[in-house]
UniProtKB/Swiss-Prot annotation:
Keyword set includes Acetylation: no
GO biological process: 'de novo' IMP biosynthetic process; adenine biosynthetic process
The name this protein goes by in its record: Phosphoribosylformylglycinamidine cyclo-ligase
Gene assigned in the entry: purM
Primary subcellular site in the record, as a coarse category: cytoplasm
Recorded metabolic or biological pathway in which this protein acts: Purine metabolism; IMP biosynthesis via de novo pathway; 5-amino-1-(5-phospho-D-ribosyl)imidazole from N(2)-formyl-N(1)-(5-phospho-D-ribosyl)glycinamide: step 2/2
Catalytic activity field: 2-formamido-N(1)-(5-O-phospho-beta-D-ribosyl)acetamidine + ATP = 5-amino-1-(5-phospho-beta-D-ribosyl)imidazole + ADP + phosphate + H(+)
Any one annotated GO CC term: cytosol
Gene3D superfamilies hit by this protein: PurM-like C-terminal domain (3.90.650.10), PurM-like, N-terminal domain (3.30.1330.10)
Source superkingdom: Bacteria
Length: 346
């Protein structure tokens, strides 16, 4: 039967080898609350040790999008898993939740053990950065659905927060200060446009260094999404945070308003932070309008935090002590949407 399945394109032995290879990486993510080991039908996590008055579970799921195609082109698969974790855990930490565990789903045309191992190695690294355990996953070999070189990757996370400490943004008022945490680069959104502008229309090479970039283009584009969990959780222990926004698809324009109550807008001070060269390259090569850039990309800011004005400098200092690059980038105002430099609302 195994031979018949292999003739149909599914290599069971390769799947077993991939699982064997990934175990050592998964083990590095374990927390004391995890029950059982890799290979069970379901992952188990003990919540009894959490001393919360009204514990609330917060879940999130996401993928990496067409950034995967850059990984295929560069044949580099050991960091794309970090992106999958980041996209999930950053989404739930903005609500004040501590990520507890993570599960992954890999669908591929052919299960190559070394490639699967590298993907899971990256996922495990992301979990370590976020402090969550990789307690399960699925690797589905689907010949005919994907080519032999292709795969898709998605992740799922669950976190916990005390109900009274959930961050909703509903208490944000005009005059609160917006602090931006620097991104590592493009992160995991907008890659369909990136490929069209830089690779298809611009015909740029992944191996070359362009403009003010410090790395070859391929390495720049595959920089992993920054995981903000640990510095944000440390911040929440010491300061009151009124709202947070993970700057993903939709950029500043779509994501900052998601944390704001009705009647409150955001005024962003352009020039208050460094916009990385990769965004300048994209805008120049693609002849893109600034409005479009801020409506698609993170433009150098991956997370925005709203705090009281009197706390702002201390919050920046704490975040910098945690290794982040943090800047005061604006404030909340009466109104709606996002305004730049007090000028045109984009």
């Amino acid at each position: 039967m195994a031979n018949a399945y292999k003739q149909a394109g599914v290599d069971i032995e390769a799947g077993y080898e991939a699982v064997s290879r990934m175990k050592k990486h998964v083990q590095t993510t374990m927390r004391k609350e995890v029950l059982g080991g890799l290979g069970g039908f379901g992952g188990m996590f003990d919540l009894s040790k959490f001393a919360l008055e009204e514990p609330v579970l917060v879940s999130g799921t996401d993928g990496v999008g067409t950034k995967l195609m850059l990984a295929f082109m560069a044949d580099k698969h050991d960091t794309i898993g970090i992106d999958a974790v980041a996209m999930c855990v950053n989404d739930i930490v903005v609500q004040g939740a501590e990520p507890l565990f993570f599960l992954d789903y890999i669908a591929c045309g052919k299960a190559e053990p070394s490639k699967i191992e590298n993907i899971v190695k990256g996922i495990s690294e992301g979990c370590r950065q976020a402090g969550c355990a990789l307690i399960g996953g699925e690797t589905a070999e689907m010949p005919g659905m994907y080519s032999t070189e292709e795969y898709d990757l998605a992740g799922f996370t669950v976190g916990i927060v005390d109900k009274k400490k959930i961050i909703t943004g509903e208490k944000i008022e005009a005059g609160h200060v917006l602090i931006g945490l620097a991104s590592s680069g493009i992160h995991s959104n907008g890659y369909s446009l990136v490929r069209k502008v830089l690779l298809e229309d611009g015909e740029l090479s992944l191996e070359r260094i362009y403009g003010r970039l410090e790395l070859p283009l391929g390495e720049e584009l595959l920089k992993p999404t920054k995981i903000y969990v640990k510095p944000i959780l440390e911040l929440l222990k010491k300061h009151e945070v009124y709202g947070m926004a993970h700057i993903t698809g939709g950029g500043f324009i779509e994501n900052i308003p998601r944390m704001l109550p009705e009647g409150i807008g955001a005024e962003i001070e352009l020039g208050s932070w460094k916009i990385q060269p990769i965004f300048s390259l994209l805008q120049e090569v693609g002849n893109l309008e600034e409005k479009d850039m801020f409506n698609i990309f993170n433009m150098g800011i991956g997370m925005v935090v709203a705090v009281k004005e009197e706390d702002a400098k201390d919050v920046v200092r704490l975040l910098e002590e945690q290794g982040e690059t943090a800047r005061i980038i604006g404030r909340t105002i009466q109104g709606a949407g996002v305004t730049f430099n007090g000028g045109t609302a984009l």
